[in-house]
Amino acid sequence: MCIRDRFKDVTFSDKDGNTYPGQMPTQWSNLKFFLSYQVNFMYWRYFMWNFAGRQNDIQGLGELEHGNWITGIPFIDNAMYGDQSLLPKTLQENKGHNVFYCLPLILGLIGLFFQAYRGEKGVRQFWVVFFLFFMTGLAIVLYLNQTPSQPRERDYAYAGSFYAFAIWIGLGVAALASWAEKLLKSKPQLAAALASVVGVLVPLQMVSQTWDDHDRSNRYTCRDFGANYLNTLPDKGCPVIFTNGDNDTFPLWYNQEVEGTRTDARVCNLSYLQTDWYTDQMRRPAYDSKPLPITWSRYYYVDNGKHSYYPIRPEHKAELDELKKQNPKVDPYELSYILDHYVKKAEGGYFPTDSVVVSVNKQAVIESGMYLPMGKDSIPDKMIISLKNAQQKQGGLYRNEVMIYEMLAHADWKRPMYMSVTLGPGNYAGLDNYCVLEGLAYRITPFNYGQTVSYTHLRAHETSLHL
C-alpha cells in the first residue's frame, strides 16, 4: 500500500451513541475517490453512454458486465472489460446494448477544436459553450458529492451537459463541410453533400441502436400496483392513504388523474406534507374526496422555519398533571388538547409529554367496517401513542408526523386511514403497533397489536381461539 493511502485508526459514534472502530481516509484517498468514482464512474461513464456506446441498461455498481460504456470496437471493449463475446445472451441482446463506435464523440471533438481555433470570435463562442458544458456536468458532480451505491443511475442529472456537447457535434458537421469545401474547391455542391451525408449517418446509427430502448408498450406493473393500492381502500368514508416518495405515489396519482380510479380516496405524500403548499392542497377537496381533517390555519404551518420541527419535552408532564387536578373533566394528555394548546403556537410549539392519548369513537369504529379482533367489546376507550422512540432518535417530531396526528385527532375514526406498505419503518409516526395489513396498505386502528400485523394473521389467530 502506498504511504499516502495509510489510514488513521479512529473511533466513530453512531446516532444512538454506540462507538465502533474505524479508519479515517487520507486526503489522497478522498481525491482518488473523487476522481475514480464521482468524476469517472458517475459522470464520464454517462457521458460515454451517449457518445460512444452503452453495455446494457442494468444498473452498474462497478461490475464488469453491468452498465459500463463501450464503443462497439472489440479490441477496445475487450481490453477494458474482458471478452464481451463470452457474456450471456441475455446481456448481449439487452435492449440497452447500444454501440455508436465513438462516432458522435469524434464528431463532437472535431466541432470543439473547430470552434476553438476560429480566431478571437471562435474562442469567445467556445468559452460560452464550454462553461455551459461544465456547469451542467462536472460542476454538478462537485455540488452533489455523491456517495457509492446510488439507488438508481443518475445520468439524467447531467442532461444539460450532453446537450452542450451536442452543439459541438453540430459544429463538427460544419467543420467537415468547411474542410470538404477546401479540398473540393471546384465542386462546392459535392462538398456540402458529403458533409450532409456524414451529418445524417451518425444520428441514424444512434437512433437505430436506441429506438428499442424506449418502448414502454405492455408495461403495466406501475399502473396495476397503483390501482391495487387504491382498490385496497374501503368504498365508503373517503379513505386516506399515506405514501412516501415519488415511486409509490405517482402510480396512484396516474390512476386517479387519468383513469378516474377511486377519486373518492385521498393520496397524501408524507414527503410533501412537510411543506406548507402541500398542506394547503390537503386542506382542499379534490374530485370526490373531502378535505383532510387538518384544522390548523395557514399561519401555524407556513414555512418560516418555526413550524417544521416540534421538540418533545417530557419534563413538562408535571404541568399537565397539575392541569388534570384542577379540571378533572379535561384530559391534558389528549392529543387534540396537546396540539391546540402546546403545538399550535405562533413562535413554534412543542410536545410537553412523551405519550399522548386519542379518544376512540366506538360507534364510528364499528360503522367503518374495521375488523374487530375480539368483537365490539374489545374496542378500547383510548389509544395511547408513545413518542419515546421519536424523542430518542430525533428529539422531536417533524411537521409531516404532526400532521398525521392532527388528522388522527380530528377524524374521530369516521375516516379510514392507511399507510402504504412501501413506507419505511421510520415513517409510521409511532403508529406501527396499531397497524393491520389489509391488501396493500396498513390500516390505522385503535388496537395495540405490539407490531404491524396482517388481517389474514388476525383471522387465523381468532379461528384458533375457537378450535
Label each PLM-derived region with a short phrase:
Residues R4-Y158, F165-C238, F250-L467:
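ER/secretory pathway lumenal C-terminal domains and tails of membrane proteins involved
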